[in-house]
C-alpha cells in the first residue's frame, strides 16, 4: 500500500490546541468494525458500550518535561528533546542546532542556562548527553524542562500542560508524548467503570518522539518503525487470559496499549500472550492479524501516520477512512487534545482487498 492512501483533508481549525474543560467531556465517534456503522455521542457513553467483565488496558507511562532550551558554551543556540533516559545522568536526545555539537561540546541548558551538560557521542540521529549535575535526570527535567507538546500544537507549553498533558493514572516516568486516548478518563469516570464491573490492567510503553515522525517512504511496507520501551507484566497476561476465558473483550486504551499487547503476543512461544519487557518496533498496518485486542479507544490521528494505519488494520481501511471523512464533516476535534473513537475489531480487516488507483493491495 502507498502512504498516500492514508491521506485526508483536515482543516487547520479542527486541530485541538487545548483540551476540553472536563476530561470526559469530549465527543465519541463509535465505529462498529464488522459493519462500518458509525454512532455519534459523548465519551461517557463508553459506560454503555462496555459490559461487566470487559478488560480495559491502560498505558501508565508518565510524560517527562523533556524539552530544554539553551546554547553551546561557545555560543550557538540549541534545543534539546530527551528521547530516552539511560541512567541517572545520561540521556539520548534529539538536538536542534544550526551546527550539530561534536563529542566533548559543553552545553548550557535551561532558561537560565544553569544546567551544564556534555555531548558524549552521536548515535545515528540521537545524541548521548551527560548532565554534569549531582541531581538525577528526572529531577533536573522537572526543575527546568518544558512539556514536549506535539509539533502540531502551535503554541508554547504552559504550566497547566504539566497536568493536562498527563493521564490521571500515570505512574512510570519516561514518555516524551502522552498516550492521548487516556487523557479522557477522569477519576469519576474510572470510578463508574469499576462500579459497573469493568476490569482494569496497566501496561507501560514510554512513548518516544518518533510517534510524530512522518513516514518518509512511498510504500508503507518499506517504513522502518522507531523503537520504544514497553512492559507487559505477568498480572496483565493473567488478566487478558482470564478475560478471554470468560468470553469478554480486551479493550485497549490507545494505540500504545495495542502495540504493547500485540508485542507481548508476538513474543509468546506457546499460548496467546506472554510477559514482555524490552524494546518494540512493532509496525501494525493493513494485513496484520490482531491476536489480543478486541476493541480500541483512540483519538483521531494525523494523515499518513503509522497510527491511522494501525487503526485501518483494526477496523478495516474503508471503514476507517469513511469514519475520518465523517469526523471532519461533523467537526470533531483532532489529535492529542481532541475527541475520541471507540472501535470494535473488524475480523475481515486483515483480508480486505484495497483497490486504489487501479492497483489491488492486500
From Swiss-Prot:
Which reaction is the catalytic activity of this chain? Answer: 7-aminomethyl-7-carbaguanosine(34) in tRNA + S-adenosyl-L-methionine = epoxyqueuosine(34) in tRNA + adenine + L-methionine + 2 H(+)
Cite the entry's keywords alphabetically: Cytoplasm, Queuosine biosynthesis, S-adenosyl-L-methionine, Transferase
Named in its record, the pathway it takes part in is: tRNA modification; tRNA-queuosine biosynthesis
**GO-annotated molecular function:** S-adenosylmethionine:tRNA ribosyltransferase-isomerase activity
* GO BP terms, alphabetized: queuosine biosynthetic process; tRNA wobble guanine modification
One GO cellular component term noted in the UniProt record for this chain? cytoplasm
SUPFAM superfamilies per the record?
Answer: QueA-like (SSF111337)
Q: What is its EC number?
A: 2.4.99.17
Localization per Swiss-Prot or TrEMBL: Cytoplasm
* Summary of the function given for this chain in its UniProt record: Transfers and isomerizes the ribose moiety from AdoMet to the 7-aminomethyl group of 7-deazaguanine (preQ1-tRNA) to give epoxyqueuosine (oQ-tRNA).
Recorded family membership: Belongs to the QueA family.
Q: Which HAMAP family does the entry mention?
A: QueA (MF_00113)
Which PANTHER family does its entry note? S-ADENOSYLMETHIONINE:TRNA RIBOSYLTRANSFERASE-ISOMERASE
Oligomer and partners: Monomer.
Q: What is this protein called?
A: S-adenosylmethionine:tRNA ribosyltransferase-isomerase
Source organism per entry reads Yersinia enterocolitica serotype O:8 / biotype 1B (strain NCTC 13174 / 8081)
Name the encoding gene, please. Answer: queA
